[in-house]
Amino acid sequence: MIPALFLVICVVAFRAMTGLLIHSGAATWLSNFAPLAAIALCCAAYLPSRYKFTLPLVTLFISDLILNATYHAALFDPQILCRYLALAVVGLIGFALRRRATWKTMLPASLATSVIFYGITNAFSWLTDPGYAKNFAGLVQALTVGLPQYAATPSWMFFRNSLLSDFAFTAVFVLLMRVQSPRASAEVAVARAA
């Protein structure tokens, strides 16, 4: 449990630092390389009931506080609320895997939830952003290149980085859960059954 909580703390620091680097223009290639979906998936699968959903959402909220203050963005708007909803869907999938969370289930689930998260958030952007035509071509634009003002980081790049980061951070989380002492692993197994 302690390694998992340590990882969540590291996630906030990682997301805040990469967000600040991206904002400064020093690391645009890191756009959307964030471990939040992996944390939502893994927390729901591995952690005790009181942490399953609250920890990922609190992690997102704290990192949003830092980044939105930097970007001078609103803390709550429809796009952000959609992101929270999509993260909750990812958590529900992790919750469904809680009794069979292994390498064989969690790594493919990380890829599937990346697709789901990307689909939900980009479809929402397409539906709500007046910059997209409300037809199939507009949806394809939202899913591939995005809006012209964001040409430096097209949508497909966000998706690629999301896939890579979700897979990598899920692997790290599962590894940390596996290397715990037998006693800690037994505590997690008992907590998962609750």
Task: Give the label of every model feature segment.
Residues 1, 184-194:
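Short, charged juxtamembrane terminal tails flanking transmembrane helices
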Residues 1-54:
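Hydrophobic transmembrane alpha-helices
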Residues 4-6, 53-54, 81-85, 107-111, ...:
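Hydrophobic alpha-helical transmembrane segments
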Residues 5, 30-42, 80-89, 164-168:
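Membrane-embedded alpha-helical segments of multi-pass membrane proteins
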Residues 7, 53-63, 106-115, 173, ...:
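Central hydrophobic cores of alpha-helical transmembrane segments
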Residues 16-17, 42-50, 89, 93-101, ...:
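Structural signal for the C-terminal ends of transmembrane alpha-helices
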Residues 16-32, 59-93:
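Interfacial aromatic-anchored transmembrane helix boundaries in multi-pass membrane proteins
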Residues 102-182, 186-187:
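Membrane-embedded alpha-helical hairpins and interfacial helices in multi-pass inner-membrane proteins
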